């Protein structure tokens, strides 16, 4: 109550300016958001914003749903089932080129450093990325790390076509990796490390080849949004991005609060594990030179272009998107409201 009272006392004018549709409609604006995955630390900033009333303070009634990966989330946003979703930007580019009428755009960057990676055992034969040539790697066809692997491989000087991919359900695949059935596993690094830790193989036993450490400049996930929502309710989209930014800045400053929000939404979640995951996300994808300079959610033209170019190379796309058809910054809050605090 004290926080909310203080917020009302000091920020009422700002809130009304950010959400002028409140007065016009006299009610909260409904907004649907897809996490793109199950309830875990990757969605902590959104869940914390909801828990702390940031969306409501800006005039929104936000419904946050779980998802089944980026491809599914993007399709749902493209079909109008959701206003926005957390999703891999490379997958969004691929979707837009296949469905030009969809016209989805990213309105904020969630993972400034790309979290895609390949994970191997320290005591195994793979000591450097080039050693992956001809090896067996766990990774499903929809897996973003698998889809972007060709860019990583070519940058390291080996032919990706010689790799044998094993399409095994993640839970079963993780267990088999620990048993030694595969040479490597393709994952978001924070997902793979903790999945394997839960099966008895700790981070100290693993080497992680993060694509961003080996030349990849692409952004990771962003807030992918529906064009009708952006056009018909621009103030609602601005309010959503501003409140979500607030939630993620809180998580960066206080990861324990973010993990607690995950636990509050999903009582079966392991709060300690989600705290560890959130710390990996914060330190590994959000506390970066770019976000420290430009704030959470912002993007630079050079890296946006790199995201397009690397996606085209990885997916074998015959055409690409101009930046204006892929990204807009008009829904971002002010630089002061994006600034990292922790």
Task: List PLM regions with ranges.
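Short, glycine-/small- and polar/acidic-enriched structural segments
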Residues: 25-179, 183-190, 209-211, 216-217
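Pocket-lining segment of extracytoplasmic ligand-binding domains
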Residues: 171-175, 182-268
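Secondary-structure end/capping motifs
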Residues: 232-314
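Conserved C-terminal helix/tail region of periplasmic/extracytoplasmic solute-binding proteins
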Residues: 304-342
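N-terminal export signals
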Residues: 5-24
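Short linear loop/turn motifs
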Residues: 63, 71, 167, 209-212, ...
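Flexible glycine/proline-enriched surface loops and loop-helix/loop-strand junctions
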Residues: 131-134, 177-178, 222, 243-245, ...
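Short, surface-exposed acidic
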Residues: 160-164, 203-207, 268-279, 318-325
């Amino acid at each position: 109550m004290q926080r909310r009272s203080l917020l009302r006392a000091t920020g009422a004018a700002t809130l009304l300016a950010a959400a002028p549709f409140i007065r016009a409609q006299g009610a909260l604006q409904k907004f649907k958001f897809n996490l793109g995955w199950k309830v875990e630390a990757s969605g902590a900033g959104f869940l914390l914003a909801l828990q702390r009333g940031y969306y409501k303070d800006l005039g929104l009634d936000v419904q946050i749903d779980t998802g089944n990966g980026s491809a599914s989330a993007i399709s749902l946003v493209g079909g109008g089932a959701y206003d926005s979703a957390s999703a891999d930007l490379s997958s969004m580019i691929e979707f837009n080129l296949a469905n030009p009428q969809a016209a989805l755009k990213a309105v904020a960057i969630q993972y400034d450093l790309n979290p895609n990676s390949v994970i191997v055992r320290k005591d195994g034969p793979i000591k450097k990325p080039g050693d992956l040539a001809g090896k067996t790697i766990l990774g499903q066809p929809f897996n973003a790390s698998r889809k972007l692997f060709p860019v990583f491989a070519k940058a390291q000087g080996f032919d990706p076509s010689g790799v044998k991919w094993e399409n095994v359900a993640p839970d079963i695949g993780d267990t088999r990796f620990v048993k030694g059935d595969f040479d490597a596993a393709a994952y978001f690094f924070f997902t793979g490390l903790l999945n394997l830790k839960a099966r008895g193989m700790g981070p100290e036993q693993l080497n992680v080849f993060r694509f961003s450490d080996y030349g990849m400049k692409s952004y990771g996930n962003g807030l992918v949004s529906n064009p009708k929502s952006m056009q018909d309710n621009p103030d609602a989209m601005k309010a959503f991005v501003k409140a979500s930014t607030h939630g993620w800045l809180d998580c960066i400053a206080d990861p324990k609060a973010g993990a607690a929000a995950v636990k509050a939404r999903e009582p079966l979640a392991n709060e300690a594990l989600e705290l560890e995951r959130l710390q990996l996300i914060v330190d590994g994808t959000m506390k970066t030179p770019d976000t420290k300079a430009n704030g959470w959610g912002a993007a630079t033209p050079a890296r946006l272009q790199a995201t397009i170019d690397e996606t085209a190379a990885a997916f074998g796309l015959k055409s690409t998107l101009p930046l204006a058809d892929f990204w807009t910054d008009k829904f971002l809050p002010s630089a002061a409201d994006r600034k990292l605090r922790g």
